[in-house]
Amino acid sequence: MNLQDVILTPIVTEKSQDLETIGANSKKGTRMVKYTVKVHIDANKTLIKEAFKKIFKVTPSSVNVQVYRGKIKRFRNMPAARPHWKKAIVTFRDGASIDFAKEA
């Protein structure tokens, strides 16, 4: 799999924005910043870490992954399945920042 295809989109929610700002404003010794992104369903933790190293030139300290199953929804009175998707929460130490708009 190409490393450019691993990271799909950043997830912008209130909780993900809090993870970015709370870690950056930490008063403890190490500042940890967490970014939440939607990744390819076949990507694993090491592939996600390599993609961040290559694309953003920043090495993550840890990667947490969650898989969401697609829901069954109705479309024109017929059941249709939404696709499964994967979310990664990537942690950086020492307050490393990423600008997703610049790298797009």
UniProtKB/Swiss-Prot annotation:
Organism of derivation: Leptospira interrogans serogroup Icterohaemorrhagiae serovar Lai (strain 56601)
Molecular-function GO terms, alphabetical: rRNA binding; structural constituent of ribosome
Similarity annotation: Belongs to the universal ribosomal protein uL23 family.
Function text: One of the early assembly proteins it binds 23S rRNA. One of the proteins that surrounds the polypeptide exit tunnel on the outside of the ribosome. Forms the main docking site for trigger factor binding to the ribosome.
InterPro entries in the record: Nucleotide-bd_a/b_plait_sf, Ribosomal_uL23-like, Ribosomal_uL23/eL15/eS24_sf
SUPFAM superfamilies xrefs: Ribosomal proteins S24e, L23 and L15e
Any one GO BP annotation for this protein: translation
Protein name: Large ribosomal subunit protein uL23
Keyword annotations from UniProtKB, A to Z: Ribonucleoprotein, Ribosomal protein, RNA-binding, rRNA-binding
GO cellular component, one term: ribosome
Subunit structure: Part of the 50S ribosomal subunit. Contacts protein L29, and trigger factor when it is bound to the ribosome.
Pfam families in the cross-refs: Ribosomal_L23
Gene (UniProt): rplW
